[in-house]
């Protein structure tokens, strides 16, 4: 193998070298075929095939090709050149199998032709291909390692997060605390990635991240610096703290809120206890009153907060169970002219959507003051007995009745027994859904309480009795819906035989309205109104008018009375007064004379009240309500009887 380079040196005139085709790579096959066709002859090819000297010619051809390849691989290493003769021998054998002549120099070119596939491992241009495998083998771990590290590295500076770097910075300090600027300096000095990012332009991003992480993680605490004008210290939380984001808190909804389920459970228990209380017999008026939804005993203290949200102006002493429910004013100083309008109204009216004008806006303060003066009269005590009896009315429940005996009554004259004026819960049945009809204009008109006809003596006796407090004979006023000064006019005071009898609440019906021993005078008045073509009977108190009674000062106070609670008469007669103006009718005592001139043109603007919506949405909410709109009883005339109606007061 050492002789091959010497052959190259001694034979510089090797013929194929100056040929152009030997310098090209790879050698074009058409040119090689053309040279074979021009230089070779069929005879030598045939002779070579049969001549025994073909092996010698192949050997000489292989030697020549070896010299040729050695000239091409002058820059090759010795070990690479040692493999060349074998490759060339294979090429020569391939050329001999094709029938090329070994004696002619032309086949050397043919020998060169099969060599082109072989030179890649031996030629100078083929040196890079062996190198890349070794280089790839050597660089493989180097190239693969960055990819592995890049996938495992969390940040450009390494696997440590900002919080970890801040922790190392604080721990590296002697006092275990650093200011924000000192943390910046430690980052630039200690972390190679931030060494060239200390200027203001390139540091804005990572400094912001430092501040963000200091505030985000609870493991870092901020300590106020004692010096003035110095930034705070940042220290590690001695309790540890969390170094990650806290879990998101979802907004409470009806699905995942446990408070909603608890409130529903409490409401169910409260309703069950209320029903069990209704089943038990009542031994006192209070036990009977607790059956009513409007009763003070039917609401717990928790309900008052709910009622106050609907009626924020409920600030009277009737808004608490322990409040003193009395028509006698105990605090007159805090009663302003604008607060006299506060009257009791039924609980169903508490959920009326429309805002109604207050009574003080349409009333005369002087008349109200006169009424207060009459209510504050002093007189001798009277006896008041409370009894419980069953009402003969078919629709009446067992209700308390009250007997009122004036001390000055003679033995011959029968004492007016007020047990006839029973108050019960009216029986009602659902009202069919019918469109609202109004007989008059859409504006709600209000009448006036023309006259309060009663004897001052009887009024005095009632108000100054030594009997139990008046709240024993009062209606079960819902404390949540009573207005501030409901004790003035809204309490259901039983006055003399000719006195005004306010309603016992919206659910009360007056059973027997006439005193058989009373002296009556001819004359009566009526009002009729229709809602959906059906007449609704109002509860009327027909009280005797004696000749010895004097009139109180006329109270010219228009009262708003919604007709949303139809009452029924189960007594001697009905004094029906109905009128339809969006569910509000004229209220008051009506005589043959004309109304005062100041009440004729009184109309309240901007009053909307859809009776159908109230009946369907509000009244049907009560479980104990049962509506029954029967035919109106025939109107029976009572001579010169005074009419009062159930006052369903509407708040302002």
From Swiss-Prot:
User: What happens when you mutate residue 259 to Q?
Assistant: Mimics acetylation. Cytoplasmic location in absence or presence of insulin, no change on the inhibitory effect of oxidative stress on insulin-induced phosphorylations, but no inhibition of these phosphorylations by resveratrol
Q: Which PROSITE patterns match?
A: FORK_HEAD_2, FORK_HEAD_3
* Induction statement: Expression is regulated by KRIT1. Transiently up-regulated during adipogenesis (at protein level).
Asked if the Swiss-Prot or TrEMBL record annotates the protein with the keyword Aminoacyl-tRNA synthetase, the reply is no
Family annotation (Gene3D superfamilies): Winged helix-like DNA-binding domain superfamily/Winged helix DNA-binding domain
Q: Which residues carry this modification: Phosphothreonine?
A: 24, 330
Listed result of changing residue 245 to Q/A: Mimics acetylation. Decreased DNA-binding by about half. Enhanced phosphorylation by PKB/AKT1, no effect on interaction with CEBPA
Q: Which residues bind DNA?
A: 156-232
Upon changing residue 413 to A, the result is: Decreases phosphorylation by NLK
Q: What is the effect of changing residue 253 to A?
A: Abolishes insulin-induced phosphorylation. Nuclear location but transcriptional activity decreased by about 50%. Abolishes the SIRT1 deacetylase binding and increases acetylation
Q: Where is this region: Required for interaction with RUNX2?
A: 360-456
Cite the GO molecular-function annotations of the record.
Answer: beta-catenin binding; chromatin DNA binding; DNA binding; DNA-binding transcription activator activity, RNA polymerase II-specific; DNA-binding transcription factor activity; DNA-binding transcription repressor activity, RNA polymerase II-specific; promoter-specific chromatin binding; protein phosphatase 2A binding
Top-level taxon in the UniProt lineage: Eukaryota
Changing residue 462 to A has the effect of: Decreased transcriptional activity by about 2-fold in the absence of serum. Nuclear location but transcriptional activity decreased by about 50%. Abolishes the SIRT1 deacetylase binding and increases acetylation
Tell me the residues on which Omega-N-methylarginine occurs: 248, 250
Q: Where is composition skewed (Pro residues) in this entry? A: 114-133
Q: What is the effect of changing residue 415 to A?
A: Decreases phosphorylation by NLK
| Protein name according to UniProt | Forkhead box protein O1
**Organism expressing this protein natively:** Mus musculus (Mouse)
């Amino acid at each position: 193998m050492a002789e091959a380079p010497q052959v190259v040196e001694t034979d510089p005139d090797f013929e194929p070298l100056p040929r152009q085709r030997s310098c090209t790579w790879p050698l074009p096959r058409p040119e090689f075929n053309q040279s074979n066709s021009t230089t070779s002859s069929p005879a030598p090819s045939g002779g070579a095939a049969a001549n025994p000297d073909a092996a010698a010619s192949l050997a000489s051809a292989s030697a020549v090709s070896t010299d040729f390849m050695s000239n091409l691989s002058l820059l090759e290493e010795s070990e690479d050149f040692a493999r060349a003769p074998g490759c060339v021998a294979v090429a020569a054998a391939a050329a001999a199998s094709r029938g090329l002549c070994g004696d002619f120099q032309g086949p050397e070119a043919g020998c060169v032709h099969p060599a082109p596939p072989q030179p890649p491992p031996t030629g100078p241009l083929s040196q890079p291909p062996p190198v890349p495998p070794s280089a790839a083998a050597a660089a493989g771990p180097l190239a693969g390692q960055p990819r592995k590290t890049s996938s495992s590295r969390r940040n450009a500076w390494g696997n440590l997060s900002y919080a970890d770097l801040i922790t190392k910075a604080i721990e590296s300090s002697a006092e275990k605390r650093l200011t924000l600027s000192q943390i910046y300096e430690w980052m630039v000095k200690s972390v190679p990635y931030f060494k060239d990012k200390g200027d203001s332009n390139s540091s804005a991003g990572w400094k912001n991240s430092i501040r963000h992480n200091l505030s985000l993680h609870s493991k870092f605490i901020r300590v106020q610096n004692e010096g003035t004008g110095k930034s705070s210290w940042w220290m590690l939380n001695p309790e540890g703290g969390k170094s990650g984001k806290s879990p998101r808190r979802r907004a409470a909804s009806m699905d995942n809120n446990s408070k909603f389920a608890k409130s529903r459970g409490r409401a169910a228990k409260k309703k069950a206890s209320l029903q069990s209380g209704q089943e038990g017999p009542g031994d006192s008026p209070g036990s009977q009153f607790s059956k009513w939804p409007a009763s003070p005993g039917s609401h717990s203290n928790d309900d008052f907060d709910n009622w106050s949200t609907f009626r924020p102006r409920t600030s009277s002493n009737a808004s608490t169970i322990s409040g003193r429910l009395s028509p006698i004013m105990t605090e007159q100083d805090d009663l302003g002219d604008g607060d006299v309008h506060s009257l009791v109204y039924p609980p169903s009216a508490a959920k009326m959507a429309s805002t109604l004008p207050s009574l003080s806006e349409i009333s005369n303060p002087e008349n109200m003051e006169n009424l207060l003066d009459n209510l504050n009269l002093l007189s001798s005590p009277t006896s008041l007995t409370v009894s419980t009896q069953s009402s003969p009315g078919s629709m009446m429940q067992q209700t308390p009745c009250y007997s009122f005996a004036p001390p000055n009554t003679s033995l011959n004259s029968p004492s007016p027994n007020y047990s006839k004026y029973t108050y019960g819960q009216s029986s009602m049945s659902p009202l069919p859904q019918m469109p609202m009809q109004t007989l008059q204009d859409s504006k709600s008109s209000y009448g006036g309480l023309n006259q309060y006809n009663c004897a001052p003596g009887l009024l005095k006796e009632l108000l100054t009795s030594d009997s139990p407090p008046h709240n024993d004979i009062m209606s079960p006023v819902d404390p949540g819906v009573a207005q501030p000064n409901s004790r003035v006019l809204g309490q259901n005071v039983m006055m003399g035989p000719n006195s005004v009898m306010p309603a016992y609440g919206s659910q009360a019906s007056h059973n027997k309205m006439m005193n058989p021993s009373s002296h009556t005078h001819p004359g009566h008045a009526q009002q009729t109104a229709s809602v959906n073509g059906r007449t609704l009977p109002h509860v009327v108190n027909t009280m005797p008018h004696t000749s010895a009674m004097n009139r109180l000062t006329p109270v010219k106070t228009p009262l708003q009375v919604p007709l949303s609670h139809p009452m029924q008469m189960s007594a001697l007669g009905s004094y029906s007064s109905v009128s339809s103006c969006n569910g509000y009718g004229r209220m008051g005592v009506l005589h043959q004379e004309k109304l005062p001139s100041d009440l004729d043109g009184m109309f309240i603007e901007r009053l909307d009240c859809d009776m159908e919506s109230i009946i369907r949405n509000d009244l049907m909410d009560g479980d104990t309500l049962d509506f029954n709109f029967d035919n109106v009883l025939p109107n029976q005339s009572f001579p010169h009887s005074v009419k009062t109606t159930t006052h369903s007061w509407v708040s302002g």
